[in-house]
A protein has these predicted regions:
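Generic anion/oxyanion-binding catalytic loop in active/binding sites
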Residues: 1, 45, 59
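N-terminal, positively charged/glycine-rich alpha-helical extensions of SAM-dependent methyltransferases
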Residues: 1-31
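Catalytic cores of glycan-processing enzymes that make or break glycosidic bonds
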Residues: 11-14, 43, 78
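Conserved alpha-helix/loop element of class I SAM-dependent methyltransferases that forms part
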Residues: 24-55, 69
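Class I SAM-dependent methyltransferase SAM/SAH-binding core
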Residues: 51-103
Length: 103
């Protein structure tokens, strides 16, 4: 792997856990409130076509909050990211949400 690719991945890997714990990303709200949408998706919503029933691929999904928000609006979403640590945080949030909904 090229050195710049390794450094870039390490940079995003290092950001994943702090971002997941940050109130700016509000991961805990996604688990607690099934209607919560990310700030990014709420901002984009007036500019987006109807997403219900559509399939979407979210590139650079990071910790998944925008991807989950689009899914909450009815899209079938797949999130991809360069950072394994970011994807692990996204999976963790979804697993916590599923556990809460199953309880």
């Amino acid at each position: 792997m090229d050195e710049w690719v390794r450094l870039n991945r390490a940079n995003w890997d290092e950001r994943a856990a702090p971002h997941a714990a940050s109130p700016d990303y509000a991961v805990e709200r996604f688990v607690a409130d099934p209607d919560h949408l990310s700030d990014v998706v709420r901002f984009d919503l007036p500019r987006l076509p109807e997403v219900r029933g559509r399939r979407g691929l979210h590139l650079q999904c990071h910790i998944g909050t925008d991807t989950l928000s689009l899914a909450r609006l009815g899209a079938t979403m797949t999130g991809l990211d360069f950072s394994p640590a970011a994807l692990a945080e996204a999976r963790s949030a979804v697993e916590a949400l599923v556990t809460r909904l199953s309880a």
